Amino acid sequence: MTRTTKKAAAKLNTAIAGAVKRFAPPESLTVDEWADKHRRLSPESSAEAGPWRTKRTPYLEEPMRAFTDPKVHKIVMVAAAQVGKSELELNIIGYIIDQDPGSILYVHPTIDDARKFSRLRVAPMIRDSKPLKAKVHDVKAKDSGNTILQKSFPGGMLTLTGSNSASALASTPARYIIGDERDRWATSAGTEGDPWALAEARQATFYNAKAVEVSTPTIKGNSNIETSFYQGTQERWCHRCPECGEYSEIVFDNIHFDPEAKRIRGKKSWSLKSGVSWSCLLYT
């Protein structure tokens, strides 16, 4: 065999190995297991950059596991601000790209919100997570075909848009729909009507479609995310009491604190005398 033939054979072997790797079956992982293994928090968006650890946010484990349950077709999460709702969405997106690819429609309140989230959260996640970096080409890469609002990967495409964009909501078939901050959405996508209904209509041809809807709630009785929550199983996060061992929901009435008011430079200022404590229903 000549040197030229050996080089050609080596190139062919490399090409075949790459092709075979693409046909490798996905790992048998749930979303939280995938995140613990592959997700890295980026320094731009996290106070603790480095490997993702589900144990730091245990209340996200069940929603992430529900996503890989074939019996579950929609997940609704109602939660306070800054408790990990966006990280839930990002972990699900990463899992889809790497493990169960399909078209994703990721809807934010406005297109500007979508652009900002893509730059500050999605792009760093792809850059810092090896499986995603290998499958999603950088926007700046030559011939990548990707933009800030649209990113292709083997088996699917991630499209980010706003609830006020009727064209994107009405024209993009999608197996997966993810709705961020649902209570801040436009009441109508132009003249086309309810943005969520338009988005869900994009899933009509997918037997294995899944939807994720998250938001901080606004006004009780006039909240889209509240309505969606009450249409589901209405599961709530409960904390185990260190005294009796029973699980109880953490509600404001069971949180105890002793405030005191002081005047500082002529203005009333409130502070806590001795911190904050929580008690379960049996010890309230």
Describe each PLM feature range.
Residues 1-282:
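Phosphate/NTP-binding elements of NTP-utilizing enzymes
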